[in-house]
Amino acid sequence: MNLNDIATQLLFTTVPIRGNMPNGSVKTGTGFFFSVKDEGNPNQIIPLLITNYHVLENITSGFIEFNIQQNGEPVKDKSVKVSFDSNIIDNNKLGNLDLVAIPIAGVINDLLQKNIQVFYKSILPEYIPSAQEIENLSAIEDLTFIGYPNGLYDQTNHNPIVRKGITATPIWNNFKGKPDFLIDGGVYPGSSGSPVFIYNQGSYPTAEGISIGTRLHFVGVIYETSISTANNQTTFLNLGIAINSIVIYDELKLYVKKLLDN
């Protein structure tokens, strides 16, 4: 396993979430790691787990499954499940967005006390494209999104499912007046909370032509699957809706400030 490879690192930015509902049904979703710095103390890193609010809403209990590390590398056949209850979403909602941010430093430290080291890679603020970079994107961009569609993942190696798609609406437009964009790709229930990337290897289009090299942008988070219902039959349209990462980061900065003030 080449952990210096960007694509390999992206495999470890997500975790599966499984929750129990009061009626006995089960919800599945995707969470991802995002780390921010304390602006007052740049040496302090605040690791967060982010997912959709609706993934955790009304859940009575559940678990998040982390990869375990040994000698700085993930152990393929080992993981640890961390339980949670309905309090997990308390005071953690990101404004009016369908997102929650959960501080995980305490969880990681508790596991360390039990000699359990988890392995993960955080998405960083510098992966978010600037407003100018978004304006310079093509209307049709290749997208990569990572998660657990229908709760599916490689439970032996503890890896998520990586899927590809394209922008069905330009990222620089607000889809239906909201800070969203539409994805044409295999977006199914369980994909909620999946981070969406523009990840190009070798070359990619720019406003000036074709650039040589690698490009990585964290552009959004999936929160809805588009379906059509007719004659009591549900048809997935292979479309998903994602929240723009710039808006997410704006809310995250407010959330972290509130977190530190408390």
Where would I find each of the regions flagged by the language model?
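C-terminal subregion of chymotrypsin/trypsin-like serine protease catalytic domains
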Residues: 7-10, 198-262
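Short loop segments and helix-boundary regions at transmembrane helix junctions
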Residues: 40-42
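Cytochrome P450 catalytic-core helices
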Residues: 51
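Hydrophobic pocket-lining residues within nucleotide cofactor-binding pockets
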Residues: 55-56, 226
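Serine endopeptidase catalytic core focused on the charge-relay Asp
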Residues: 11-15, 19, 27-28, 32, ...
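N-terminal targeting leaders that route proteins to membranes or the secretory/organellar pathways
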Residues: 1-4
